């Protein structure tokens, strides 16, 4: 089986928006024989962009999985979104993949979202190769793209191909391993001629090959010895070194082409097979057993079954689909599994391999593979499913909290019931989507990562669930926190005939910067019985959902229960829960709570002519400029700007740059809001 696993490649395609990820994926499907016709993103016909919203907008919204064969290897491919609002799709895909292809726009090189997805891949130690796409584009520069990798990503980027021609004259590439020229005919089948290197490229190719060998030889001692002794390295020597460097995540080989014009994708597929790891090349997955002890699982079908659920989707024909990556053991359809995260047993009805939104039934799946499961009702993203006799919880995923919200109101009574179902289904699918009811107004609030994110979700409610809703204006999701330390008492006593209620606590509250809510039990001598401590914590968690300033969630607070008392008859869990919330309210009077506003990382690209206007506009929005650099005939500006100041920015940027400016925005952190903003928020809240 290890021999078979060696032939697996689980990889994703990741990039900045519009770099050509999906077009590259479509060419891969065509060349591997998975598709018999090429689907184009701009025609709304891409296989991997199957959602109606994706076809209309020409962007990828949800990660799409497929599988194919190439030169005797089994490929599991996931095409991920490039827009920051859907970064959760990239995060959960990279968590379960063994490798990735980073696609760069040949004109722009590393762009802001490239940096984001690169960081995500680094977080999960995902080996990568790089495809510089759109080499036929005006202004395309392969060597500039490599420099941006070195300067902006700080990585060892090594060309293993160089282009022949550029822009409209791009005709092929030189393979620096083989020292041969590949000249493409540009037709769908991507036929090419292998020729000697043109004379006017020979010197450049020799210099670049020498640089490549310098970069890669260090990854194998035997090869390094041959190289230093002046021996000629074989093609296999070089490939072995590149593979080792890639798997160590210390080397990033760079290829070039233009997927849309059918140049370079077959060589990219060769590189996926040659250089990206198989499941047995990556480190074992870590987790904890049912006693909390660390445990490792290897990609071995003979070990106990363990898999991670990384995505949940709703299929109109089969219902709930749960995507899993199997790390060890084997799973058969019709069997029972144990959800160690939820402590529940569930039955696997069917197993399917996904091709975008199409399903191919399979009977079983083994370690190292990816599939979707039908029949799991309680398993959600990040859950571990395993053998009940050998329980394990694998390393879990952590997702960003929503920063923007809006109200949704059903248009009719019939829509009310359908809306509740739609929201619960969408929340199951998307860990960065939240829905709740505003207790003061009774409104249903939905929260997400950005305006586009919420716009797509509302559109899905209307189309997929036939729910008609009125939508409110986007609102900022503020937070609150404490800035000083205080001890607070919470005492709840109620006597109304029969058994009373008694709960009494003393809790120390203190700021807990960037560490979330932390609860500490410092009770000694049984002053508060152990069985009520959890209820104290639960009472605080509930109280934190509505802060003292404007009713926003209170975050980054440490609460230590250190004293209290109890009554033999009247004490109850509910009484201590209420006492804890009373202590929180008392603390809020003296801990000097402040309002926190979300601060966004904003990357703006503008032509030189409009640079001053754009900079001035950012400053007006309370933005802090962090850096700028020249990119061709444009300026790239990095800034931190409060989210509340960014509504309507797309329209203003278009106006200020004659439609030529672009920007990308993502959440950075929460920071204390100025007094004027706090007062505005309090006034607005009071009017509701």
Curated annotation (Swiss-Prot):
It is found in: Cytoplasm. GO terms for molecular function: GTP binding; GTPase activity; translation elongation factor activity. Pfam families: EFG_C (PF00679), EFG_III (PF14492), EFG_IV (PF03764), GTP_EFTU (PF00009), GTP_EFTU_D2 (PF03144). Gene3D superfamilies: 3.30.230.10, 3.30.70.240, Elongation Factor G (Translational Gtpase), domain 3 (3.30.70.870), P-loop containing nucleotide triphosphate hydrolases (3.40.50.300), Translation factors (2.40.30.10). Residues 6-280 form the tr-type G domain. Signal peptide: none annotated. It comes from the Bacteria. InterPro entries: EFG_II (IPR041095), EFG_III (IPR009022), EFG_III/V (IPR035647), EFG_IV (IPR047872), EFG_V (IPR035649), EFG_V-like (IPR000640), EFTu-like_2 (IPR004161), G_TR_CS (IPR031157). GTP binds at residues 15-22, 79-83, 133-136. One of its GO terms (biological process) is ribosome disassembly. One of its GO terms (cellular component) is cytoplasm. Keywords: Cytoplasm, Elongation factor, GTP-binding, Nucleotide-binding, Protein biosynthesis. Catalyzes the GTP-dependent ribosomal translocation step during translation elongation. During this step, the ribosome changes from the pre-translocational (PRE) to the post-translocational (POST) state as the newly formed A-site-bound peptidyl-tRNA and P-site-bound deacylated tRNA move to the P and E sites, respectively. Catalyzes the coordinated movement of the two tRNA molecules, the mRNA and conformational changes in the ribosome. Belongs to the TRAFAC class translation factor GTPase superfamily. Classic translation factor GTPase family. EF-G/EF-2 subfamily. This is Elongation factor G. It comes from Ureaplasma parvum serovar 3 (strain ATCC 700970). The gene is fusA.
């Amino acid at each position: 089986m290890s021999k078979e696993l060696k032939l697996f490649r689980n990889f994703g395609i990741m990039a900045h928006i519009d770099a050509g990820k999906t077009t590259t994926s479509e060419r891969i499907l065509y060349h591997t024989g998975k598709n018999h016709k090429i689907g184009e993103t701009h025609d709304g016909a891409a296989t991997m962009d199957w959602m109606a919203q994706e076809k209309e907008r020409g962007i990828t919204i949800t990660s799409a999985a497929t599988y194919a064969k190439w030169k005797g290897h089994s490929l599991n491919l996931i095409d991920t979104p490039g827009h920051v609002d859907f970064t959760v799709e990239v995060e959960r895909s990279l968590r379960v993949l063994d490798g990735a292809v980073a696609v760069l726009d040949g004109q722009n090189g590393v762009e802001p979202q490239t940096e984001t997805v690169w960081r995500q891949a680094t977080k999960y130690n995902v080996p990568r190769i790089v495809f510089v796409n759109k080499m036929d584009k005006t202004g395309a520069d392969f060597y500039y793209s490599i420099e941006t990798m070195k300067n902006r990503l700080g990585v060892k980027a090594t060309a293993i191909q160089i282009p022949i021609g550029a822009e409209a004259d791009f005709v092929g590439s030189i393979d620096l391993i083989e020292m041969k020229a590949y000249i493409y005919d540009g037709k769908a089948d991507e036929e090419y001629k292998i020729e000697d290197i043109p004379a006017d490229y020979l010197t450049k190719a020799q210099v670049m090959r020498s640089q490549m060998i310098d970069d890669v030889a260090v990854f194998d001692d035997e090869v390094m010895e041959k190289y230093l002794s002046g021996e000629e390295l074989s093609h296999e020597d070089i490939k072995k070194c590149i593979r080792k460097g890639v798997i160590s995540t210390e080397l990033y080989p760079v290829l070039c082409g233009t997927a849309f014009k059918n140049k370079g994708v077959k060589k990219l597929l060769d590189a996926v097979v040659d250089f990206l790891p198989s499941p047995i090349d990556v480190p074992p997955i870590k987790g904890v057993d049912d006693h909390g002890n660390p445990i490792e699982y290897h990609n071995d079908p003979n070990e106990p079954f363990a898999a991670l659920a990384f995505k949940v989707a709703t299929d109109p024909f089969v219902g709930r689909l749960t995507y899993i990556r199997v790390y060890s053991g084997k799973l058969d359809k019709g069997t029972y599994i144990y959800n160690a995260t939820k402590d529940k047993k569930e039955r696997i009805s069917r197993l399917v391999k996904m091709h975008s939104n199409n399903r191919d039934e399979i009977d079983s799946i083994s370690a190292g593979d990816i599939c979707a499961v039908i029949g799991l009702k309680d398993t959600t993203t990040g859950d571990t499913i395993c053998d009940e006799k050998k329980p394990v919880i694998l390393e879990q995923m952590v997702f960003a909290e929503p920063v923007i919200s809006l109200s949704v109101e059903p248009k009719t009574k019939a829509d009310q019931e359908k809306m509740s179902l739609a929201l619960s289904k969408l929340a199951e699918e998307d860990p960065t989507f939240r829905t709740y009811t505003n207790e003061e107004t009774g409104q249903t609030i939905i929260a997400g990562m950005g305006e586009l994110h919420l716009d797509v979700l509302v559109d899905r409610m209307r189309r997929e669930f036939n729910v008609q809703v009125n939508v409110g204006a986007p609102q900022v999701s503020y937070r609150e926190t404490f800035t000083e330390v205080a001890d607070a008492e919470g005492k709840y006593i109620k006597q109304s005939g029969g058994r009373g209620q008694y709960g009494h606590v003393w809790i120390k509250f203190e700021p807990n910067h960037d560490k979330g809510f932390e609860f500490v039990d410092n009770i000694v001598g049984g002053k508060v019985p152990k069985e009520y401590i959890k209820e104290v914590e639960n009472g605080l968690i509930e109280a934190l959902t509505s802060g003292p300033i404007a009713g926003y969630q209170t975050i980054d607070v440490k609460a230590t229960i250190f004293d209290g008392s109890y009554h033999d008859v009247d004490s109850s869990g509910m009484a201590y829960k209420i006492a804890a919330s009373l202590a929180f309210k008392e603390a809020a009077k003296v801990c000097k709570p402040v309002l926190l506003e979300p601060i966004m990382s904003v990357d703006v690209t503008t032509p030189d002519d409009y640079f001053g206007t754009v900079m001035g506009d950012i400053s007006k929005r309370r933005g802090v400029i962090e850096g700028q650099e020249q990119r061709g005939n444009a300026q790239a500006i990095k800034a931190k700007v409060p989210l509340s100041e960014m509504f309507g920015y797309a329209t203003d940027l278009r106006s200020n740059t004659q439609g030529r400016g672009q920007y990308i925005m993502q959440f950075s952190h929460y920071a204390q809001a100025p007094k004027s903003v706090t007062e505005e928020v309090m006034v607005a809240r009071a009017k509701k």
